[in-house]
């Protein structure tokens, strides 16, 4: 039975309704909550408990699921306007101090500093307090640091959990699990010749045109998800997993800026992107990006890491393919629990199984559970973010200076091998 209180800012928003409440329900069905554990849903709208629960049930159908009504009994609603100090005073009257108190910031980063300040002023930044922060955590290195500095006045690094749902995916979890539990693979790890990290989507920007046009594929996917996966592959495994984040920081700090943009970076935009709703008619935003990156470490010096992400592709793909010197390949499928090992002397790939046979929580549920347990392993440290932004900023500067042209590609018909030929030469 889990014992905690969670305050969810932005409880009436899209993410909360689509992912967060369902994930909390999933945790409840797996582990149970103590009777006095509470989920305090917070939003700007003035709603009664009954009105909010009606809205929640309309969006999620939780009331019709097994144990759904039991779970809903843990939820109450409180109107908290983030710019209203009196609302935080009301929150402080019902928030607990004798067990983990988790604040989930499912709100715009522009409200992070104000919200953190109000929590601190009302003595809600005690030793049991934890903050879960949603991306985007900055637009570049400068804004990333500014966000952290505005919060760190009131909360310590060990109280902050920066959520990246990719780190909760079973396929990503398998990377670390396989490395920890297979000594033979660790021998192979010294013989890696190339790594391909790929996330392709058939969908376009859909209803996110205005948001996406400001960030593009590089910021949306590479800066966080793909670089986090890279760090899990390239890090030296510590004796204590609590030191994993320190090792990942070391790896990300060794990312080398491109020496030849045109041979190391390809960017493109799908045809028709500029006709999407709320997208600028002369937009230079990339919907396809492929990077040939290098690390300056003894083990991986000269080993290319291909980071690839695109929208409106012919097929969906989320995978990590590791190539070894002896023509062997190891492939992780990030959206499913599947790992294949292809050996040069075997005609058919070997399907590897992971040791963890327990039913796996979905990404947001897995990460919420980790935060409740005060486990930071699957959350990025501030220094990880800063190291990744140092690398990404060099690419953004290159884009702004047109160091590599913005190509165009036909939706769902891109010939990947031909398009990426400069990277693999």
UniProtKB/Swiss-Prot annotation:
GO terms for molecular function: glucose-6-phosphate dehydrogenase activity; NADP binding. One of its GO terms (biological process) is pentose-phosphate shunt, oxidative branch. GO terms for cellular component: cytosol. Substrate binds at residues 165, 169, 201, 220, 311. NADP(+) binds at residues 44, 135. Pfam families: G6PD_C, G6PD_N. Keywords: Carbohydrate metabolism, Glucose metabolism, NADP, Oxidoreductase. Pathway: Carbohydrate degradation; pentose phosphate pathway; D-ribulose 5-phosphate from D-glucose 6-phosphate (oxidative stage): step 1/3. The keyword Oxidoreductase applies. SUPFAM superfamilies: Glyceraldehyde-3-phosphate dehydrogenase-like, C-terminal domain (SSF55347), NAD(P)-binding Rossmann-fold domains (SSF51735). The active site is at 225 (proton acceptor). InterPro entries: G6P_DH (IPR001282), G6P_DH_AS (IPR019796), G6P_DH_C (IPR022675), G6P_DH_NAD-bd (IPR022674), NAD(P)-bd_dom_sf (IPR036291). Signal peptide: none annotated. It catalyses: D-glucose 6-phosphate + NADP(+) = 6-phospho-D-glucono-1,5-lactone + NADPH + H(+). Its EC number is 1.1.1.49. Catalyzes the oxidation of glucose 6-phosphate to 6-phosphogluconolactone. Belongs to the glucose-6-phosphate dehydrogenase family. This is Glucose-6-phosphate 1-dehydrogenase. The gene is zwf.
